[in-house]
């Protein structure tokens, strides 16, 4: 049984999307559905296909932003888990399998954030999940730091929605992403509500 749907929001990112899908074709765990929500692209993005994956492309007439796109994807999804994946990411071969293993380790886990590495500086972190400070501010964990410092799992306040897995039933309880956040900070808002 397919347990996870990967939802990729896209806006005029044809080349990025093609590369992202190629990395998904190399996943060791292929038990996923792929859903691309295109936000009214004019660059031919809706012509992108996969050679080996079943992929559904939903072409929206206008740009609804990150939240609008992923909310539609979450509404269309019937799998227990959903991975939200930015089109400019490159997933390592164990990505899907490791995220599934982590979220299935406890029914109390709502989301899991992978160790996100900078695209052009592979020795540096891009994001290791969001944390919450004593001052009441949320911040990205590990940005610009050496990746070796972030090899152990830890509790985080919220997962970066650019590459995280979520337990879909929790969204049904707390609501989807707030579309007032066209792009950015939507994942922190979900962390507050979860």
Which sequence ranges carry the predicted segments?
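Short, flexible, basic/aromatic active-site loop/helix in glycosyltransferases
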Residues: 114, 133-156
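Short aromatic/hydrophobic "clamp" motif used to bind/position activated sugar donors
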Residues: 82
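Conserved donor NDP-sugar-binding/catalytic core segment of glycosyltransferases
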Residues: 90-133
């Amino acid at each position: 049984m397919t347990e996870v749907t990967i939802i990729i929001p896209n806006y005029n990112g044809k080349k990025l999307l093609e590369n992202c899908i190629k990395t998904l074709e190399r996943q060791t765990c292929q038990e996923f559905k792929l859903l691309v929500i295109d936000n009214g692209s004019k660059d031919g993005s809706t012509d992108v296909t996969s050679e080996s994956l079943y992929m559904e492309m939903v072409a929206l007439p206008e740009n609804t932003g990150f939240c609008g796109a992923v909310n539609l994807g979450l509404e269309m999804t019937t799998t227990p888990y959903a991975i939200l994946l930015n089109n400019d990411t490159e997933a390592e071969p164990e990505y899907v399998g490791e995220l599934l293993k982590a979220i299935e380790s406890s029914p109390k886990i709502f989301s899991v954030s992978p160790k996100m590495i900078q695209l052009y500086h592979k020795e540096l972190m891009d994001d290791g999940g969001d944390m919450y400070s004593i001052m009441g501010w949320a911040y990205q964990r590990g940005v610009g730091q050496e990746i070796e410092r972030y090899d152990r799992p830890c509790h985080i306040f919220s997962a970066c929605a650019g590459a995280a897995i979520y337990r879909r039933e929790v969204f049904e309880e707390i609501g989807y992403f707030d579309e007032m956040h066209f792009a950015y900070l939507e994942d922190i808002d979900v962390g507050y509500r979860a």
